[in-house]
């Protein structure tokens, strides 16, 4: 099925300064990146899903909603695994870890290997190449 546009889809701000997200995890990650930059002031935001297939738009929304709803729980798990406070991590790393952890811990239909791989790819694509090993280690 070809991707279709939907006027009822929720949209956040610009996906990133460089490009629109090409997939659900990128859309969710970009919205979480905006939130991570503002934390602890979490505002109402949603992934930019225009141009994504309906199932990808839905996945982006589910990842984002689960991450924001359980932000503190996921942060505690990430801090325990990474042995460092979330506040010391770059926003792109926090966003990637939150999205990955939400998929692994809260979403039962997402394989762990896919969540880890896509989280590493997200952080690399947003300029965090050096941090990709950290994301991989914490989520595994």
Explain the meaning of each model-derived region:
Residues 1-140:
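Class I Rossmann-like S-adenosyl-L-methionine
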């Amino acid at each position: 099925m070809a991707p279709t546009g939907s006027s009822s889809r929720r949209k956040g701000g610009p996906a990133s300064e460089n490009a629109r997200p090409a997939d659900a995890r990128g859309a969710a990650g970009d919205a979480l990146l905006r939130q991570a930059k503002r934390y602890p002031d979490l505002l109402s935001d949603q992934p930019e899903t225009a141009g994504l297939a309906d199932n990808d738009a839905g996945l982006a929304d589910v990842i984002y909603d689960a991450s924001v709803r359980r932000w503190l729980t996921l942060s505690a798990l990430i801090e325990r695994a990474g042995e460092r406070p979330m506040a010391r991590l770059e926003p792109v790393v926090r966003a990637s870890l939150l999205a990955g952890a939400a998929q692994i811990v809260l979403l039962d239909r997402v394989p762990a290997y896919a969540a880890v791989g896509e989280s590493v790819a997200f952080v690399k694509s947003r300029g965090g190449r050096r941090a990709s090993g950290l994301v991989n280690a914490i989520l595994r």
